[in-house]
Amino acid sequence: QPQPDQANHTVDFVLTVNPGRKYYVNQIHISGNNKTRDAVIRREMRQTEAAPYDSAKLNRSKDRIQLLGYFDDVKVETRPLPDTPDQVDVDVSVKERSTGSVEVAAGWVQDTGLVLSAGVAQDNLFGTGKSANFRIARGKTQNTASLSFTDPYFTPDGVSLGYDIYYRGFMPYKSSSSSSSNNYETTRIGLGARMGVPITEYDRINFGLGVEHLTVKLHGDETYQPYRYRQFIQEHGEKNWIVKGN
C-alpha cells in the first residue's frame, strides 16, 4: 500500500505478507513390495515423517528408489488428512521386477576345446537390498571361479561394504598346440574388500584392498620355458603374496 509524503516528495510502500499454511508429513505408507523389505525403501526417503513437507525432497526420494533397480514403476503421492488440515500422508507404491539371473553357456575354442561357464546373480538378496553373484568357467587350459557380495548400507548412513573371492588357473601347457612359449601355468587365489563412503547426496568415494596368492610353475624342458617366467621364479620363487589397493 503506497503512503505518499508530500513534504519530501517521496512515497513509502508497505508490503503485507500473509504466510501460507505449513504442511507436515504424518506417515509414509509403502505398498507393492511383496519381496523387498520396507526398510530398503525407507532408507532412500529424503522426506521423513513428522517433518515439514518438502516437494524437492519427495522428488529426490522417488529418484533414489527408482535408481535401486528393483522396481519397474514407482509412484509417490500425497494424501491430505481430513481431520488435520496441516498434515498429509505420503503413499509410495512400487511394482517389483525380477532382480536375479542365471546364466549357462558353452563354447568351443581352437586349441583348448570345449569351455563351459555358469553364473548366478541376485541384486536384491532375500529382499534386503544386498547383492551377490557367483561365476564359474572351466576349460582345458583355463579355470576360473569368483564370488562377490555387496552390502550397500553396511552402516545406516550409507557406507557400503563388499567382498570378492576368486580363483584363476591358467595352464597353456595343456593346449593341443603347445609350443616353446606355453610350458608354464599360473594359479591366482585372491580375496578383497571394497568400501564406498558417501560425501554428498550425489557423490561418494570408493576404495578397496585385496591380497592375492600367486603360484607360477614351469613344465618340460627348460629350453621351452618362457624366459620371463624363469626369471620371475629365480627372483621371487614359485609362490608369492601380492597386496593390491585401489
Q: PLM features: what roles do these ranges have?
A:
Residues P2-R21, P82-T99:
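Self-splicing inteins and homing endonuclease
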Residues Q1-P4, K22-Q27, V216-T223:
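Interfacial loop/beta elements and low-complexity acidic/Ser/Thr-rich segments
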Residues Q1, D12, I28-N33, K57, ...:
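Acidic, glycine-rich loop-and-beta core segments that form the ion-binding/anion-interacting portion
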Residues V25-I30, V102-A106:
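Disulfide-bonded cysteine-rich modules in secreted/extracellular proteins
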Residues Q6-N8, R21, N34, R138-Q142:
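A generic beta-sheet turn/junction motif
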Residues A51-N246:
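Gram-negative/organellar outer-membrane beta-barrel architecture
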Residues K35-A50:
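N-terminal periplasmic "start-of-domain" segments of outer-membrane beta-barrel proteins
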